[in-house]
Amino acid sequence: MQAVRCHGPHELKVEDIEGPGMAPGAGEVSVRIERGGICGSDLHYYHDGGFGTVRIKEPLTLGHEVSGVVAAVGAGVKRVAAGDRVAVNPSRACGTCRYCQRGEQVHCLDMRFFGSAMRFPHVQGAFSEQVLVDEAQCFKVLGSLTAGEAAMAEPLAVCLHAVNQAGPLVGAKVLVTGSGPIGVLCAAAARRAGATEIVATDVAPLPLKTMERIGADAVIDIAAQPDALKGFSQDKGTFDVVFEASGREAALVGALDAIRPGGRIVQVGIGGDMKLPMTQIVAKEISIRGTFRFHEEFGTAVDMMNKGLIDVSPRISQTLPFRQALAAFDLASDRSTAMKVQLAFS
């Protein structure tokens, strides 16, 4: 079978691989992949060969935002059957370490996450024609939900976890800085959680247009209007919660004037270390929380999409055949023309 593999910076190839035996063992499921979304981490591997201190040391099959059809199931599998459409959770916690035992699987000491070079040998990803996964990683897709929409379960789960980190949002005024796929989904999840006012910022027009489509109350092009947030800084600030989805120090620092005393900042984007004005943070009693991946939120994401509670379709901008992966990755790298680019495997 064929897969999309990264060998190093700008060394992306569609090539034949020897996958594990596709006859599933006990508790395993073989899934024929239909759609796969290109994530920011995939782009880091493509452009830089990794991120931070993590570097590709062997060919790495990319991809962790995928959906497909069950090809076969192993002995004892009950939650899915051959022919079922599924979203595949890329996260496989060990279940036995102290964090898993405390219900904090996101911090698992032996985590295996699709398409990751954080451990060696690397954990291969799901941008391949077929994958073998544990039964617990499969979530049924129902009704008219498309394969592309089902593949958005992973980024939606990331944002649902971020919303859980934010605390109560009923009646909240929310600022989202960075309106890429994650920022847009954070806005949608915040609205579903009860936020009554959502303002979004970005430096590119396309993401802001998508924010408008999903119902943001106001959008601000910070590149064109660098002082536009100052209007929200009166009386010590306006927003109850900030979702910082850009990973940019300037975005986080700029939000501090606009957040009210006692407000909560959830740092979603990862862009490296930042220098923060601690005096302002202390004086305004601002809480800053990190958010990383997800666990139970993946099942919630699929359930919400199955029930039509969140429409992820506006975030999908282009779909290309997986054999055109190089063109797809270049397209996904251009924020002026693309939001979420997906690969079609069927």
Regions found by a protein language model. Name each.
Residues 158, 182, 190:
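Hydrophobic/small residue at the entry helix of a nucleotide-binding pocket
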Residues 20-36, 50-101, 142-144:
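Glycine-rich beta-strand-centered segment in the early N-terminal region that forms part
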Residues 94-177:
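NAD(P)H dinucleotide-binding glycine-rich loop of Rossmann-like/cofactor-binding domains
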Residues 259-260:
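Helix-to-beta-strand junctions that scaffold the AdoMet/dcAdoMet cofactor pocket
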Residues 1-65, 129, 219, 346:
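Short N-terminal strand-loop motif that marks the start
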Residues 176-179, 191-254:
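Adenosine-nucleotide cofactor-binding segment
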Residues 1-3, 253-256, 295, 299-346:
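C-terminal hydrophobic helical "lid"/dimerization subdomain
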Residues 264-266, 276-315:
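Rossmann-fold dehydrogenase core element
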